[in-house]
């Protein structure tokens, strides 16, 4: 039995509220159970220096957590004077994931920065950030298309992410913190709307896992991604 009472293949409730910020070119608030992440997209009219005069655009991401997103207060990283290794790893993952869903030549020489701020954390914050970040990106690109700044749509597919793991000996979908903190194996799966793999991160936290178990988790992830893509489409109308 899962702590939440969910079935093994059952996602947490998912909602995505678009256009929650006045100034950002794209924004949304994604809720996956008790994990809530505010995602925004900001368009910059020039690419990073390494892409100057290449005709290619770029999508990058920044990630952070509010001090009381967790059960006890975390010190702000700005106060500490540097980002943690975990933060750097997560924001690189978000950027890689979202870039896999765009045609950078169609985007042109500009950069879109996705900011993901965790308001409340209960497991799966990086997955929620990718899923919500894509919606913010989509909304920002829509503005570029409407203004005629870009001619062809640079977004080639949906991108979403979900966690899966082995909890109490059973493969489960969309781990919350109670499960994630004690899972024998956990993983993050990033897929496109067409169910193509972008990134898989899996690790054995306790015992090793088999190839068959990995396949079971991928099957769960594919079903979860389908639900998340449906939520993205519903948010965009």
UniProtKB/Swiss-Prot annotation:
It catalyses: tRNA(n+1) + phosphate = tRNA(n) + a ribonucleoside 5'-diphosphate. Belongs to the RNase PH family. This is Ribonuclease PH. The keyword DNA-binding does not apply. The lineage of its organism: Bacteria, Pseudomonadati, Pseudomonadota, Alphaproteobacteria, Rhodobacterales. Keywords: Nucleotidyltransferase, RNA-binding, rRNA processing, Transferase, tRNA processing, tRNA-binding. InterPro entries: ExoRNase_PH_dom1 (IPR001247), ExoRNase_PH_dom2 (IPR015847), ExoRNase_PH_dom2_sf (IPR036345), PNPase/RNase_PH_dom_sf (IPR027408), Ribosomal_Su5_D2-typ_SF (IPR020568), RNase_PH (IPR050080), RNase_PH_bac-type (IPR002381), RNase_PH_CS (IPR018336). Its EC number is 2.7.7.56. Phosphate binds at residues 86, 124-126. The keyword NAD does not apply. It comes from Cereibacter sphaeroides (strain ATCC 17025 / ATH 2.4.3). Homohexameric ring arranged as a trimer of dimers.
